[in-house]
């Protein structure tokens, strides 16, 4: 998945990852291929609910224009369903959802201004 992103993205402002061992290992693959201005490992993303994740996102500073979140299910899948117009059963491990928010501030994110741009599963790239 990291190699797939190289063709699409060369830099992301902020990598925000759960502090679990598994997500730390996953993040290393992305860090080896993509430039991040800031990286944070956060206990609050460990098994957090969609509502908790959305609250965390809404508290990002506006210096970040692009953010990558590495977290856990079912919270991550539920978050995607909550803020987009899709009904996803499960975002698989290392699955990617690219979402655009048409708003000026992170705390203004809502379903009404969110657009799912891309949804990629690892098995699609094999």
Which residues make up each language-model segment?
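An N-terminal RHG(E/S)-centered segment typical of histidine phosphatases
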Residues: 1-11, 33, 63-64, 77, ...
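Active-site-proximal alpha-helix that buttresses catalytic centers in soluble enzyme cores
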Residues: 1-44, 48, 90-91, 126
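Beta-strand elements within well-structured catalytic alpha/beta cores of enzymes
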Residues: 16, 65-71
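Hydrophobic packing residues within well-ordered alpha-helices of enzyme cores
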Residues: 26-30, 53, 79-80
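Short alpha-helix plus adjacent loop in nuclease-associated cores
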Residues: 45-57
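Non-DNA-binding regulatory cores of transcription-related proteins
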Residues: 60-63, 73-94
